[in-house]
């Protein structure tokens, strides 16, 4: 069972986001102990960077273990059919017992859609190609029962943020904090989303949040279409 699935995003004027991804998992069965003995997280090195900030295990017997995040493994993510060069970070927790609680935080910076080609090697590659604009698609479904799921994003005061929640409902709010607009979206008691034979992708059927700092939804699509036209992506011959 997931007790908390929380993401906090701080958006810079360039559109780059700094993400704090926190998760608290309670092991209830031997099967759950096996499933959670290793933590994995996927990211695209062309557009983002991710690392474990902390991992704490609260044992059922009262013992508290702080894991060494320097033992993190970073490797090419498993793929098939199409190989995008995605990577995965992994940290082994080791043996768990029912009643143990795993609490970890992952720090990520970057954005969530692909570049046309390889970017620079410095932090400028984490700035979205549509410079100054922030965009995200947040899945609000879960593979395990989740007590609370929260997505919180802070944007500069001068930026506007439009959003739409699809295939469900969530609680939302906007507040002014530390010279930023802070938007919070939350759902309680999220149950695993059932799948059916030959159904569409979960992004087209399960609850999700979409947001963009562009004045209109279509602006991002029009911008990318124009860039790809100029790049020659739609040319009939290479």
Predicted segments with their positions:
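Early extracytoplasmic/domain-onset interaction patches
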Residues: 1-41
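Residues within well-ordered beta-strands of beta-sheet-rich folds
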Residues: 22-24, 101-107, 152-154
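Surface-exposed beta-strand/loop patches in extracellular or lumenal glycoproteins
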Residues: 24-53, 129-158
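Carboxylate/His-rich catalytic cores and anion/metal-binding grooves
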Residues: 32-64, 206, 210-225, 230
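Solvent-exposed beta-strand/loop surfaces of large extracellular or lumenal domains
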Residues: 46-89, 113-137, 164-185
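Exposed beta-sheet edge/beta-hairpin loop segments within beta-rich domains
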Residues: 90-95
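Secretory-pathway-linked proteins and extracytosolic
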Residues: 109-120, 129-133, 140-238
